[in-house]
Amino acid sequence: MLSEDEAKDLLSFLTLEMRADVKGQATGYILGLTGNRDGCRYLQSKPDFLKALVTLTSDPSIAIVKDCFHALINLSADETLHQPLVKETEILSKLIPKLQDPEFVFSDRICTILSNLSRHEQTCRDVFKALQELNVGLDRLVEIFCTEGFNKKASLHYLAPLLSNLTQLPEARHFILDKDRCVIQRLLPFTQYEESITRRGGVVGTLRNCCFDYVHHEWLLSDAVDILPFLLLPLAGPEELSEEENEGLPVDLQYLPEDKRREEDPDIRKMLLETLMLLTATKVGRQILKSKNVYPIMREFHKWEKDPHVISACEKLVQALIGDEPEVGMENLMEVEIPKDVEEKLQELDAKEQEQMEKDKQELEKSQNESPEGLER
């Protein structure tokens, strides 16, 4: 790495006033450092370099700004850099307001940086607080996200994982679930947004987080929100169901066409199942999912699914749908207190199950990659 004198000289080149060619070489060197862990950890102890990168995101040179944003994306991907970036620089106050500029070229990079910084609770709170203080707020963020073509130069897909990360905070979920704001209803259609897996996954993650607030389950499943079809449709396929089974389903799930395709990403399929599973944690949720005939959709999905982790999530949901009701006093599974020894045993069993599923997944991938003997590729 650089000596102290070399670092001092390099830092002197990272100013708005420096000649563009010299500055470009300096930002290019810093970008190279951020391409590996050792370089990132070196910069972790150099807050002046971090400050300079943030400042240069306002440079007149597009090439220099691009390098700085690329470097900040790399740095923000390293959790150990989150606190230095948030506490030692003006990264939040400099970048967040630019999201509201429909002409800003680098908005997608800002979304990625904010998504990275909000992955863990401590800096997630910093991001949430900054949004409020800078008069952007979740309401404006959702409005920008839901306005197609808001920025002609950026897709803003990474606002979805940012929203998902923010909803790990109770106060963010409280906003999304505010019955007077009609926020969650605006997000629901994006569970089937074909143009971007990032947008779909982020929205499904947001819905899953919101379903941890079980007091809202009845409202979420009511006609006021009608969340169920938006969770089920990506899991439903073209299989023909009986007339009786179709009639029991929500209208949007009835008599699906022969070319109906399921969600292609296994991680999103798993999150959808986990969201449905959360809704079965309350008595009212279980009753509604059973009355809406969710089981046939899951039955056909289970036949189709190949990923071991997703299959396991599906089987747990099916068990909740067809199993007996919990005994009196245990109707709300999120309020049940589990003895510590039982909890530890369950965690141990879950770890073993995860390990076995990972082995199964590796075996499946291996078998899919091997060519049948005697056949030309």
From Swiss-Prot:
Gene3D superfamilies: Leucine-rich Repeat Variant. Residues 340-373 form a coiled coil. InterPro entries: ARM-like (IPR011989), ARM-type_fold (IPR016024), Hgh1 (IPR039717), Protein_HGH1_C (IPR007206), Protein_HGH1_N (IPR007205). SUPFAM superfamilies: ARM repeat (SSF48371). Residues 339-377 are annotated as: Disordered. Transmembrane segments: none annotated. Keywords: Coiled coil. Belongs to the HGH1 family. This is Protein HGH1 homolog. It comes from Danio rerio. The gene is hgh1.
